Amino acid sequence: MSCFDLCRPCGPTPLANSCNEPCVRQCQDSRVVIQPSPVVVTLPGPILSSFPQNTAAGSSTSAAVGSILSEEGVPISSGGFGISGLGSRFSGRRCLPC
């Protein structure tokens, strides 16, 4: 850091070394770099929720699905997916592609 005096001479040098004017010393500006501290930001994660599905097992499921399948509003087979029920219902009729 370099400094220099801004004092002016006090005029003729008196017997006593004194001066009535203020003496100022000015130095160059200093630069300071302040690094910001790291900031931790917590973002909320996704909220995952699950809903239990109603499931049924055994013959009740096959009977329910079997009663949904129908032709002309009449269930194909109310007892499940038996081949005998399909054959008696479609005897003499043309089957449509799936």
Curated annotation (Swiss-Prot):
Under InterPro entries, the record lists:
Keratin
A single Gene Ontology MF term assigned here is: structural constituent of cytoskeleton
> Which keywords, in A-to-Z order, does the entry hold?
Keratin
An example Gene Ontology CC term for this record: intermediate filament
A Pfam family matched in the record: Keratin
Keyword DNA repair carried by entry: no
Family named by the database record: Belongs to the avian keratin family.
- Subunit note: The avian keratins (F-ker, S-ker, C-ker and B-ker) are a complex mixture of very similar polypeptides.
Q: What is this protein called?
A: Feather keratin 1
